[in-house]
Amino acid sequence: MGSLEDVKNAVKFRIDGIGLFRSEFLYMESDHFPTEEEQFHVYRQAAELLGERELTIRTLDIGGDKGLDYFEFPKEENPFLGYRAIRIGLDQKEILKTQLRALLRAGTYGHIRIMFPMIISIEEVVDAYAVLEECKDELHKEGIPFQEEIEAGVMIETPAAVICLLYTSRCV
């Protein structure tokens, strides 16, 4: 799934939930990094369509074969495992924070879960969760409603993630 139209079609088939909503399509269809409000609008609509059914949204997974016209990637020997996905978000934290704030806010309209992609180390898991908690703190201080008890996890899709799976499972 990667769009509201996909969610609408899935709901017609009485699905139990969505296990992977690919948020990168929201970015790929834009000429700029979507704002918090732009993302919130899409995630809220998806959550409302599903009601109490789970909606697992993967945070931005660009790099490798998924580029953006408005973002330059460094030249790498293996761009599929290098500077992409969660590493971009942790390096350029405002990109990740904007998305997490939108997801947390939209979670008040349904049952949203967050999935961090392309994890290669336990440090990335710890850092991603720290950014999530930072966003919760900000929203709380600003008095903005959000899904406080949001579930978050990681996508096990790299050899390094498999190797550190035992340690990762203790954190998520």
Q: Where are each of the predicted segments found?
A:
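Conserved alpha/beta-domain cores
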Residues: M1-R170
